[in-house]
Regions:
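Short amphipathic alpha-helix adjacent to the substrate-entry channel of hydrolases
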Residues: 49-67
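Short beta-strand element of the alpha/beta-hydrolase
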Residues: 34-43
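C-terminal catalytic histidine-bearing segment of alpha/beta-hydrolase fold enzymes
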Residues: 200, 209-248
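Alpha/beta-hydrolase active-site loop
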Residues: 81-100
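Mobile cap/lid helix-loop segments that gate and shape the active-site cleft of serine hydrolases
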Residues: 135, 140-175
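N-terminal cap/lid segment of alpha/beta-hydrolase-fold proteins
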Residues: 1-30
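Short beta-strand/loop motif that positions the catalytic acidic residue
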Residues: 179, 185-187, 191
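Alpha/beta-hydrolase fold nucleophile elbow
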Residues: 101-112
Length: 248
């Protein structure tokens, strides 16, 4: 059942992606939709699942916010393929939103695991900007730094040396160019889950490619900023979106 507030309707929706029933959590404003924020979650399963509180951070009276669960997660059909078929869950959702709200600005926010999810999809979609927040930018860096996740990565993708093609297929940087939408890189200097070297690496690569980008580093913060820093982060992200829309 949808939940109504004074400004939005909150509901879980289901859409088709590769003939699979995939779920997403959506906050729709009662007023005209002028901006859409697509939040790409981190984690897997219950860890990092999309919650209303997270979506509310990006909402206002004319902003629709939505977070796909990805296939194989939280009631969605299929199997989580970790940056393969689940990418279609992002692209299909974006196209549905663009068809329904063709005049609305669309911004993607990729958090943690969702960082690479966005990098692998955003340049081919009708989006105005991409914000990567505490996000994975390189699958090999992820394997190298997260010893605790290597078992899961080997099960889902393979070994980075023995199954090299599977890892190369999950590399986003080669597909990004100077015509890609503007990118904002947000990261905490004390992030222990996705090290800030992911942000540094991405920024260096974007500089080489001549892609429009900004960085917002909070060197005293971890994976999730503390409340005062969270306010600063959200303020910066929203102003970035405003500036992108102003110059679009």
């Amino acid at each position: 059942m949808p939940i109504e507030s004074f400004t939005h309707q909150l509901e879980e929706i289901t859409y088709l992606s590769d003939d699979l029933q995939v779920k997403a959590l959506m906050m729709t404003p009662h007023h005209e939709v002028k901006r859409i924020v697509v939040y790409l979650r981190g984690g897997k399963g219950q860890v990092g699942r999309v919650r209303a509180g997270r979506l509310m951070q990006f909402s206002d009276s004319q902003t629709l916010v939505i977070g796909p669960y990805y296939r194989g997660n939280n009631g969605s059909e299929g199997k989580d393929e970790f940056y393969r078929g689940d990418l279609n869950d992002v692209t299909e959702l974006l196209r549905l939103l663009h068809d329904k709200y063709p005049q609305a600005f669309i911004h993607m926010v990729g958090f943690s695991r969702g960082g690479l999810q966005g990098l692998l999809t955003f340049q081919d979609l009708p989006v105005n900007s991409y914000i990567i927040w505490g996000g994975v930018s390189d699958i090999d860096l992820m394997y190298e730094e997260r010893v605790d996740l290597r078992g899961m990565l080997r099960r889902m993708i393979g070994h980075p040396k023995k199954d090299r093609a599977a890892y190369e297929a999950r590399q986003a940087i080669p597909n990004i160019n100077e015509n890609s939408p503007p990118i904002l890189i947000v990261h905490g200097g004390k992030d222990q889950q996705v090290g800030i070297h992911h942000a540094y690496y991405l920024a260096d690569q974007l500089e080489l490619k001549g892609d429009t980008h900004e960085t917002f580093y909070q060197m005293a913060e971890g994976h999730v900023p503390r409340p005062p820093a969270m306010v600063e982060t959200l303020t910066y992200i929203k102003e970035f979106m405003n500036q992108v829309e102003l110059h679009s």
